[in-house]
Amino acid sequence: MLFRSDFKAVMITHEHTDHVKGLRIVGKKYPHAEIYMSKGTWTALKDNYRPEKNQIHLFHPKEKFVIGDVVVAPFSIHHDAVEPVGFILSKKNKKIGFITDTGHICDEIFERIKYADLLILEANHDEEVLKMCSYPYEVKRRILSEIGHISNITAGRVLCRILEDSEGPVYRQVLLAHMSMENNTPEMAHLTVESILRERGLFTFPSRYYFSIGHWVVF
């Protein structure tokens, strides 16, 4: 994990090891940092990952909180964790949406993320690559389930729906995130998402639709 020395806070989405294994180290290295997580996540967090209690700020998934001049609105997501969340961060009239580790995007989640100016969206795997990989059957079934991870195809469909539900000119920046190192590549994710958008005619009206798609985190 790399941080600026003056960073103020860490927000935890859920207790799975790939998201918290460095948390205790970060807490010791940056004792000034505030660490935010849901009450359920704190309860499920293993002792060897827990930072000092005085750094911890617990929240309910339906209650907003403030970090500096940023308003944070957590929301529940669909993952096999105790109380997993995504986030909407708002400052003035700009919004950042963050959602990874969810098996599907329900209507409630969609309403939360559709107005984000910058959306960090999971595109975890290519479904066919996952089905052919060496993972045990139970692991594959978990990933593909409604409490697993969303695929490149699902990410593309979510972005289509955002555009189709929007009125007037649309500008969005999207970072595809939480990509599997075994079952995805940034190039594969970009190609799939762009192909889905093109099939729906959403790249043919640049005066109305503008999407900037990049990639951010690979797991």
Give, region by region, the residue ranges found by the protein language model.
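Short acidic-hydrophobic, aromatic-tinged amphipathic segments that line or gate anion-handling sites
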Residues: 56-60, 211
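Metal-dependent catalytic neighborhoods of phosphoester/phosphodiester hydrolases
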Residues: 21-30, 46-48, 184-191
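Active-site metal-binding motif and surrounding structural segment of the metallo-beta-lactamase
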Residues: 1-37
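Active-site environment of divalent metal-dependent phosphoester hydrolases
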Residues: 16-20, 43-44, 81-82, 105-107, ...
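Short, well-ordered alpha-helix to beta-strand connector turns
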Residues: 7, 53, 116-117
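Core dinuclear metal-dependent hydrolase active-site scaffold
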Residues: 1-3, 60-118
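Active-site neighborhood of phospho(di)ester-bond hydrolases with catalytic His/Asp-centered motifs
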Residues: 7-16, 36-39, 97-100, 120-122, ...
